UniProtKB/Swiss-Prot annotation:
It comes from Clostridium acetobutylicum (strain ATCC 824 / DSM 792 / JCM 1419 / IAM 19013 / LMG 5710 / NBRC 13948 / NRRL B-527 / VKM B-1787 / 2291 / W). One of its GO terms (cellular component) is cytoplasm. GO terms for biological process: thiamine biosynthetic process; thiamine diphosphate biosynthetic process. Pfam families: TMP-TENI. The keyword Cytoplasm does not apply. Condenses 4-methyl-5-(beta-hydroxyethyl)thiazole monophosphate (THZ-P) and 2-methyl-4-amino-5-hydroxymethyl pyrimidine pyrophosphate (HMP-PP) to form thiamine monophosphate (TMP). It comes from the Bacteria. The keyword Metal-binding applies. Pathway: Cofactor biosynthesis; thiamine diphosphate biosynthesis; thiamine phosphate from 4-amino-2-methyl-5-diphosphomethylpyrimidine and 4-methyl-5-(2-phosphoethyl)-thiazole: step 1/1. Keywords: Magnesium, Metal-binding, Thiamine biosynthesis, Transferase. Belongs to the thiamine-phosphate synthase family. This is Thiamine-phosphate synthase.
Length: 211
């Protein structure tokens, strides 16, 4: 897929939403400026994940933004999602690319220049680099400083997205490193007015972007 806008990358987490409806919340976030959505549900059955992905795909297609599936290549293939995001301990990138084909988006988590360069060599579409700040949604996240984020961005040619604990207060510092976008969970989904918060975050990215 060409010309993907990584500016404001929303990752789902039902725990953050609590009792609020996932699909309405995601739609509100998209209306506020989210440019990319990743369905990430680690504790869901395959059937529930599949059905959730199908519902979410209808929304993302309506607004013409990509839907990325976290880890589950089988689900991505089953619903013809725009791509997947995989971590360092998930299926090898080369095998994922073989299964998905050359046109699908494949994002890879990276925590160092070495991991970033290897992912780029093996065909990653973009990199998710972090955690930049402490995050409650991924307790085992490896820390990456802003300086390291900047160095990783400067070492590769593919897009880089900063991830981990990014919110309204610190988003500008992340964007100023030169990255292509920020990945947000709680920074948007924990807000009472999700659409308004997404708009604030989008404006911060746009204002501070070096691109």
């Amino acid at each position: 897929m060409k010309n993907v806008d990584y500016k404001l990358y929303l990752v789902t987490d039902r725990k953050v939403l609590k009792e609020r409806d996932l699909y309405k919340s995601i739609e509100e976030a998209i209306k506020g400026g989210v440019t990319l959505v990743q369905l990430r549900e680690k504790e869901m059955s395959t059937l529930d994940f599949y059905e959730s992905a199908l519902k979410l795909k209808k929304i993302t297609e309506t607004y013409k933004i990509p839907l990325i599936i976290n880890d589950r290549i089988d689900i991505a293939l089953a619903i013809n999602a725009d791509g997947v995001h995989i971590g360092q301990s998930d299926m090898p990138l080369i095998k994922a690319r073989e299964l998905l084909g050359k046109d699908k988006i494949i994002g890879v988590s990276a925590h160092s220049i070495e991991e970033a360069l290897e992912a780029e060599r093996n065909g990653a579409t973009y990199l998710g680099v972090g955690a930049i700040y402490n995050t409650s949604t991924k307790g085992d996240a490896q820390a990456v400083s802003l300086e390291e984020l900047k160095n990783i961005k400067n070492s590769v040619k593919i897009p880089v997205v900063g991830i981990g604990g990014i919110n309204e207060e610190n988003a500008n510092k992340v964007i100023e490193t030169g990255v292509d976008g920020i990945s947000v969970i709680s920074g948007i989904l924990s807000a009472q007015k999700i659409k308004d918060k997404a708009r604030v975050m989008f404006d911060i990215v746009k204002k501070n972007s070096t691109k």
